[in-house]
Amino acid sequence: MKYSHMDNDCVVFENLKSRGATLTKRDGSRKIHVAFDDFKYFVLWTKKCAPYLCLEPWNGIPDRVDADGILVNKEGILALEPGGTQIFTHHISILA
């Protein structure tokens, strides 16, 4: 990844066949795996020149440039009935 990939805020993946992602340090000395069965989107983001990369499963995404700003029209919104609940689970494994 390059910082320039984050120029528009983040990188959003959807409709992935894989339900997990592994980040490996260039020298192979460290690895982290994120499993995200219950999520529609997988997002990578960082701050410019920060020493980290965030790997996050999401069920909603930031507005696109052409969004109308109306919540019910927002892509990725999950609506529950009053009093309704939903559980989402993801797992993070430190592999090395």
Regions found by a protein language model. Give the residues of each.
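Short, Lys/Arg-enriched charge-dense amphipathic segments
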Residues: 1, 8, 54, 91-95
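Active-site/ligand-binding surface loops and adjacent short beta/alpha elements
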Residues: 1-37
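Solvent-exposed, flexible loop/coil residues
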Residues: 7, 17, 38, 46-48, ...
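Residue-level detector of solvent-exposed, low-hydrophobicity positions
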Residues: 10, 20, 43, 49-52, ...
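A general structural signal for short secondary-structure junctions and capping/turn motifs
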Residues: 13, 23-24, 44-46, 82
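Glycine-rich active-site loops that engage anionic ligands at enzyme catalytic sites
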Residues: 25-66
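Short beta-strand and strand-turn-strand segments in soluble, beta-rich domains
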Residues: 64-74
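Short Pro-Gly-centered flexible turn/kink motifs
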Residues: 78-95
